[in-house]
Amino acid sequence: MLERIQETAAYLKGQMHTHPETAIILGTGLGSLVNEITDKYEISYTDIPNFPVSTVEGHSGKLIFGKLGNKDIMAMQGRFHFYEGYSMKEVTFPVRVMHELGIKTLFVSNAAGGMNPNFEIGDLMIITDHINFFPEHPLRGKNIPYGPRFPDMSEAYNKELIAKADTIAQEKGIKVQHGIYIGTQGPTYETPAEYKMFRILGADAVGMSTVPEVIVANHCGIRVFGMSVITDLGVEGKIVEVTHEDVQKAADQAQPLMTTIMRELINRV
């Protein structure tokens, strides 16, 4: 595993013109942040040794390098999901490669179903913590020596970055929520009973990604900021049939606000 990570990192280092310390994983319907990137060059996942390939509509499947404002960044346009059939090692492989490339801060975004009764479709939620409801743990197996065997997760989402994001949202007049994200396997959306259970467990929003990558980032010593766009509601009395197209539409409508916060925050890190 370590050899494969290092082989992939060595290939990318040979292609890279910059040395970013900031990475972004762009989720469902939120990939248009790449339109803000200047001086960019792209590498398709299919050209990268050992890299999985995304199969989901709305996930393009390429690494993008360039500048966001004055900051050198790398962005994953298209992430890998456990429900696609990948192992947890494959889902989180890119984060380990990021560590080899010198990434220090990771920004993640996703689409999520809101279970907090105060949430509305289109809200942005800053992730303050998460619940791991996946059936497999990304650190199961032999410990890769990027971090300890038993990593601390008491601050999985960096409090300093959360505070800065709050300041930016206030300056820009953008409404943001705060909440706990629960990560599940998918690919089904939740039943009303599951929404109710997750809410009882303390979650504010639910989705099918993010948690594995955040766990591995923390293991690697990479600090994390995460944000969800609430694309559907799992609140009793407000639950309706949901399609992937509905999720993408809601995410696309909220995208300009998320882009503003992410761009400003990345440039203040």
Describe the function of each predicted region.
Residues 162, 168-204, 262:
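Active-site/ligand-binding-proximal alpha/beta "capping" segment
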Residues 235-269:
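His/Asp/Glu-rich mid-to-C-terminal helical/loop segments that flank catalytic regions of hydrolases
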Residues 208-246:
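Zn-dependent metallopeptidase/amidohydrolase metal-coordination segment
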Residues 104-105, 204, 223:
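Short acidic/polar active-site loop segments enriched in Thr and Asp
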Residues 11, 15, 160, 164-174, ...:
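Generic non-transmembrane alpha-helical segments
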Residues 1-153:
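Metabolite-binding pocket within alpha/beta catalytic cores that recognizes anionic/polar moieties
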Residues 99-102, 199, 218:
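Non-catalytic positions within long, well-ordered alpha-helices that form the structural scaffold/packing
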